[in-house]
Amino acid sequence: MLHNIRIVLVETSHTGNMGSTARAMKTMGLTNLYLVNPLVKPDSQAIALSAGASDVIGNATIVDTLDEALAGCSLVVGTSARSRTLPWPMLEPRECGVRSAREAEHAPVALVFGRERVGLTNDELQKCHYHVAIPANPEYSSLNLAMAVQILAYEVRVAFLDRQQAAAPIVEEEEAPYPLVDDLERFYLHLEQVLSHTGFIRQAHPGQIMSKLRRLFTRARPEAQELNILRGMLTSIEKQDKYPQRGADGSEHNGKN
């Protein structure tokens, strides 16, 4: 299960933080590190501060975009303070660990950490199913990157051990599979295109409407089959003659022959 947990660092600017993160991960049994557009590449300082976790650094996956790091994941949790202009479903660290451990038994899970100074952007946070806030001392809440990783990695490990060491097998109601992040992004693109064509939103400025719709569907968290129904509804609207239809490659063409 732990191999399905991805620790994703976005635009890290200090190699020492990469090394300290690798150390924090390995102590909790996590090895899957993703670096999104790092401002510097891992170097000797990263290896030194990894303190024996150089294999985590050496095997890190370096990608250009957050979308690449999230590809194939069924659950994405982003670290954030609570004060955001657009509220989002929040988790406490313990609940984050429990949910991550449960879903990682079936599909990859990403825990996303932002830049050292400014964290994650609103656009990046909207790609997450949940946000997690670490309840630090409000008078001094300064956690460095590796500390934050250590806290969430610990919660994942505790939840993992609880599931492994339960006296009796954990019996849970069988859940239908959730769509992967890639499928959700295709749905949001499809939804925005259809709503633009119907005039419900302005194509040049989808802005707040799409943000609120993302929040709605994130909160509802539709299953894969339910998402297929929604896609089918959008396709049905597109089939009306006055709306362009999309080809397999996403290009648009008029529905009239």
Swiss-Prot record:
Its EC number is 2.1.1.200. Catalyzes the formation of 2'O-methylated cytidine (Cm32) or 2'O-methylated uridine (Um32) at position 32 in tRNA. Homodimer. GO terms for cellular component: cytosol. The gene is trmJ. Keywords: Cytoplasm, Methyltransferase, S-adenosyl-L-methionine, Transferase, tRNA processing. This is tRNA (cytidine/uridine-2'-O-)-methyltransferase TrmJ. It comes from the Bacteria. GO terms for biological process: tRNA nucleoside ribose methylation. It is found in: Cytoplasm. Pfam families: SpoU_methylase. The keyword Cell membrane does not apply. Belongs to the class IV-like SAM-binding methyltransferase superfamily. RNA methyltransferase TrmH family. S-adenosyl-L-methionine binds at T79, S80, A81, G114, I134, S141, S142, L143. One of its GO terms (molecular function) is RNA binding. It catalyses: cytidine(32) in tRNA + S-adenosyl-L-methionine = 2'-O-methylcytidine(32) in tRNA + S-adenosyl-L-homocysteine + H(+); uridine(32) in tRNA + S-adenosyl-L-methionine = 2'-O-methyluridine(32) in tRNA + S-adenosyl-L-homocysteine + H(+).
